Amino acid sequence: MGMATYAVVDLETTGNQLDFDDIIQIGITFVRNIQIIDTYHSMIRTNLEIPPFIQALTSIEENMLQQAPYFNQVAQGIYDNMKDCIFVAHNVDFDLNFIKKAFKDCNIQYRPKRVIDTLEIFKIAFPTDKSYQLSELAEAHGITLANAHRADEDAATTAKLMILAFEKFEKLPLDTLKQLYYLSKQLKYDLYDIFFEMVRQYDAKPLAKSYEKFEQIIYRKQVDFKKPTTNYNGSLKSLYSKAVDQLGLTYRPQQLYLAETILDQLMHSEKAMIEASLGSGKSLAYLLAALMYNIETGKHVMISTNTKLLQSQLLEKDIPAMNEALNFKINALLIKSKSDYISLGLISQILKDDTSNYEVNILKMQLLIWITETPSGDIQELNLKGGQKMYFDQKIETYVPARHDVHYYNFIKRNAQNIQIGITNHAHLIHSDVENSIYQLFDDCIVDEAHRLPDYALNQVTNELSYADIKYQLGLIGKNENEKLLKAIDQLEKQRILEKLDIAPIDIFGLKASMNEIHELNEQLFSTIFTIINDSDVYDDDIHRFHNVFTFETKDILKDLHAIIDKLNKTLEIFNGISHKTVKSLRKQLLYLKDKFKNIEQSLKAGHTSFISIKNLSQKSTIRLYVKDYAVKDVLTKQVLEKFKSLIFISGTLKFNHSFDAFKQLFNKDVHFNTFEVNTSLQSAKNTSVFIPSDVASYQYKNIDEYVASIVSYIIEYTTITSSKCLVLFTSYKMMHMVQDMLNELPEFEDYVVLTQQQNQNYKIVQQFNNFDKAILLGTSTFFEGFDFQANGIKCVMIAKLPFMNKHNAKYWLMDSEFTSTFKEYVLPDAVTRFRQGLGRLIRNENDRGIIVSFDDRLINSNYKNIFEQTLENYRQKKGDIQQFGKLLRQIQKKKK
């Protein structure tokens, strides 16, 4: 860092409008030579009102500013302290523009010589972080941030994180630092000066033994696992006792029973289904069972989970904690497909790419740092999004491996036989080939959250042809000699002529003409599909916000598909006998397109279940054609059931109507399953009430205004009495947004933050919801499971409608042919499972107390009400009007105190 002084600034303001809002708090942390040397903090008085949202966000109320100075009273002192410093902030444009305007209003011209944005720094230094919000960065790197959105604490936290980043940069190999310096010249801010100083002052020394070099890339040396040796002669019971004692957990007989049951099924190569209710401690139970099985037999166990979050928890938290508690060395490894792992040849190609783009430049710098620290090369560690992900995917698709490439998948394969536990997810479990050498090493598998397997299987058997994807794939090739792969081919042909390369001539003009025709044929194909949509019955699938056509003639589509496949075959003939790597990249892309169209053609000819989906009825570009290639039951049977000698399905919601039959029939083979139920009967369930309003009109599809108004009335009643947060679950985006609009217009919610589910933003929204004391979260099916919200007061989950899939839902259409009675055998069990998962959002531990409100009267007034009532056996149930609801809330609130 040298001896320069950095002024790390954070401002709190009345809003984000530069011309209308004021600063209400300023915090500055001064850093020199990787140390905090001074701080400055002041509240700033304003004549503007502080909006309720800002008060909730910052905990700054208007009375806190009454004795504070106006900015013009402290401006000169702040300027004097900052004028010679490097200006630093997180999302620097916001803070810099606000403080420059505030200075200008005081007749002070502030122009810092150098500006650094820590958002830019942290993206580069911490490439695997899931979020670059300050509070989440602080938590990820062990920095205490008690009061986020307070300027003094935010500035200090930003400074501490910046110091961590700079310390990390200084420890990098010199070759990596030099590359970062050259790339940093294309950043928005002045980070290149920092890298220049680091390179200039670098203490030259040989490359550390922990690194290796591939071309210009320095990467972390891969260290193979040693074959584990676990010296233990005791029983599972004593192993369990030691684990819970060392981990500070409560000894639970039901948890031990679950572990013993799993071990017994593994030892006897059985197929089993286990419903283990909330609080049974599934993860610890099956980890101990898998470990004990390995100790006794030497065999390793595959564990498949539903989410990345649970995978990370097992690998980064639970297994390391067990290692420490038991004084063992459990080798565990994340198992995925080859395409999920990086190759150094691909990184080298990306670094050499001359694409001039800010996000691509950041990605190159992230890759340089990531490859010095990743032990696995798992691409998902990078959490790529948006333009970076599109660019990276493009590079993967067109990459032809180098001769001496280093691929991290080979490391995974090499070490798989030296592990005790393999961790995978349902998608990879179902997608993996039987011939896959890694999966062949496992005879035994535990499938956690097994109730989600059918959804992943349906994704696996459904083939998709989308306009956007095909246009993107064609775009990677280009339409003329100045674009993408066609440009590379054109340059190759010129090189062949000038340098007399030993390859056959390439018909550039013929290739251009062929590509233009392929583009035209693709447009014709989707125009045909667009015409079919306009001439057909269209059904809305509101939960996914698409319009679907289920019944249509395929004759014209097949004609267009045949034409485009024929043209792709003729285009591929241009490259017969040419093996240059540039040609291989283009051939790879053309073959991908041909296979995509050919698979759809074959499925349509065979009469497989298909449907057309369109997001915007007026835009051809939003069309997708789906074809179901195989039965879900066939895939689950072949890819899961037949792959392992012993197989244990475990979930909190496997049973339906007191039976495992609904889950059993997802397999088309008459296999015997042992079935078990582990019920902990949490006391907290008895502390939770299910309230069913009697004054809400039955849901009417064509007129839901009254139904929505009733939901809002109950939300008002709840928030008025409790001042607590609330989760409201919907089965329709339309209803969710209607409720959102009403809440935003009502004065009762001025001091509440109303959050709504958004695409690809669930993690961020959950974090915001958990951070606010007064918040309402409106969500759809995504939030029926896998989401635990935190609340100090009463917890409340409101369920707008029972989570039945609509008969115009794509899943319903695709699964219909696999059941005799689709509603009874598939739709109803699915709805009950989702409802049980929704109840589980509230009950997470013994201390939870709260209320579940179900507005759907089908819960008590339908032919299947008894099945839903089974899910409520452990809850106190009450039916009544809104006054009785308020009375119940006051009773719960009194008990909570």
UniProtKB/Swiss-Prot annotation:
Gene Ontology CC entries for this record: cytosol
Gene Ontology molecular-function annotations: 3'-5' exonuclease activity; ATP binding; DNA binding; DNA-directed DNA polymerase activity; helicase activity; hydrolase activity, acting on acid anhydrides, in phosphorus-containing anhydrides
Q: Where is the short sequence motif DEAH box located?
A: 448-451
The keyword Nuclease belongs to this UniProt entry's keyword annotation: yes
Pinpoint the Helicase ATP-binding domain residues.
241-496
Biological process terms from the Gene Ontology for this record are: DNA replication proofreading
Q: Which UniProt keywords apply?
A: ATP-binding, Exonuclease, Hydrolase, Nuclease, Nucleotide-binding
Q: What is its EC number?
A: 3.1.-.-
Pfam families noted in UniProt: Helicase_C_2, RNase_T
Exonuclease domain ranges (all copies):
8-161
The residues that the entry says bind ATP are A276, S277, L278, G279, S280, G281, K282, S283
Query: Key word Nucleotide-binding present in the record?
Result: yes
Q: Which family does it belong to?
A: Belongs to the helicase family. DinG subfamily. Type 2 sub-subfamily.
**Mind telling me which HAMAP family this protein's record contains?**
DinG_exonucl
Function according to Swiss-Prot or TrEMBL: 3'-5' exonuclease.
- What name does UniProt use for this protein? 3'-5' exonuclease DinG
* UniProt organism field: Staphylococcus aureus (strain bovine RF122 / ET3-1)
Its taxonomic path starts at: Bacteria, Bacillati, Bacillota, Bacilli, Bacillales
